[in-house]
Design a protein with these regions (language model features):
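A structural signal for multi-pass alpha-helical bundles of membrane permease subunits
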Residues: 4, 11, 20-348
Length: 348
């Protein structure tokens, strides 16, 4: 079945019913609700700073045309004005209220007063590449990016190892209090982050990891979601495989490394995707732990573009769009594991 046939199929072959129309409206509306903000942010990241706040806004990145006029020490913006019913292109010298002083750029003479309601800016398609180059060269954005990659990769690897070990013990070993421990781990999902944030910070202070990337990584390694997801998947692995390995004198670690982990690959891929999204987008905990600019992660570094009296939206939008690229690539490469991994765990 090709994509067109799949998208245009109906509940009753050859007939379009009300439910089909409602389904299409719902799906199209949901798709637009997701795509429009992303497309708007992408287009706005290419606009010059002045164009981002211009009203009425435009989707395409445009900028006012600037012209050099003899007798003026700076370029003047070009406008289309209506004078005596005729449209002309003139350069604006200054603007006071609803009146603007305009001159002819080709033959400058005394400024002419024009009503601002009778003029519109001359614009051209412009891509503001400085929105991307300035943060990379002037604001240590590459350092923020490197720190985020380090935190994300290391935290994800440790999360997979620690959660897989805990899930292996809870799924394949029988001991007193096994279910109680599992329930206790799952119950931590109901505890808000703000409740444990202060105790976690005091622990980080006690071990001397404040303003250290390891202070961001270590407290986030063990996750109840990861333990639950991997345990549920490991329960589907036959115990006979483990017993056969023990008969062949395989150690518990070898069983875990050579048998359990390969068979749990779909669930590990799902947890890896979740972990990358969590670590890459984490803002509050790195903001609390880190204080030196050279240790900032990407999300904390983006906050530096927001001052007390001004916000550099052109830089924020450009760097936000750029920061979406790594997690998008990870998701595209691992998305085929999501359905099989979650289906195997029984997770809703």
């Amino acid at each position: 079945m090709n994509a067109v046939t799949f998208l245009t199929r109906t509940r009753r072959p050859g007939r379009i019913g009300l439910t089909d129309i409602l389904s299409w409206v719902w799906l199209i509306g949901g798709t637009l609700a997701v795509l429009i903000p992303v497309v708007w942010a992408a287009m706005s990241s290419l606009k010059p700073e002045a164009e981002i706040t211009r009203f009425p806004p435009s989707l395409l990145p445009r900028a006012a045309v600037q012209v050099e006029v003899p007798g003026y020490d700076r370029p003047l913006s070009l406008w289309t004005v209506t004078i005596d019913g005729m449209e002309r292109e003139m350069a604006m010298v200054r603007r006071v209220g609803i009146k603007a002083q305009m001159v002819d750029p080709a033959n400058p003479g005394p400024p002419v007063s024009v009503d601002t309601r009778e003029m519109s800016p001359v614009q051209k398609l412009t891509i503001a590449t400085q929105n991307f180059t300035d943060p990379l060269t002037q604001f240590n954005f590459l350092t923020f990016l490197k720190n985020s990659v380090f935190v994300t990769v290391v935290a994800t690897v440790l999360t997979l190892i620690v959660n897989a070990m805990a899930a292996f013990a809870l799924s394949k070993y029988r001991f007193r209090g096994e279910k109680a421990i599992f329930v206790l781990i799952i119950s931590t999902l109901m505890i808000p982050l703000t409740v444990v944030m202060v105790p976690a910070y005091l622990v980080i202070v006690g071990v001397g990891l404040v303003d250290n990337l390891w202070g961001v990584i270590i407290p986030t390694v063990a996750t109840p979601t990861g333990v639950f997801l991997l345990r549920q998947y490991m329960l589907t692995i036959p115990d006979e495989l483990i017993e056969a390995a023990r008969v062949d004198a395989a150690s518990e670690f070898r069983i875990f490394w050579r048998i359990i982990l390969p068979l749990t690959a779909p669930a590990l891929a799902v947890l890896a995707i979740f972990s990358v999204l969590w670590r890459w987008n984490d803002f509050l905990w790195p903001l609390i732990v880190l204080s030196s600019r050279e240790n900032f992660t990407l999300q904390v570094g983006l906050n530096a573009f927001q001052g007390e009296f001004s916000v550099q939206w052109h830089y924020i939008l450009a760097m936000t769009f750029l920061s979406l690229a790594p997690v998008t690539v990870v998701f595209l490469f691992l998305q085929r594991y999501i359905t099989t991994g979650i289906a195997g765990t029984g997770m809703k």
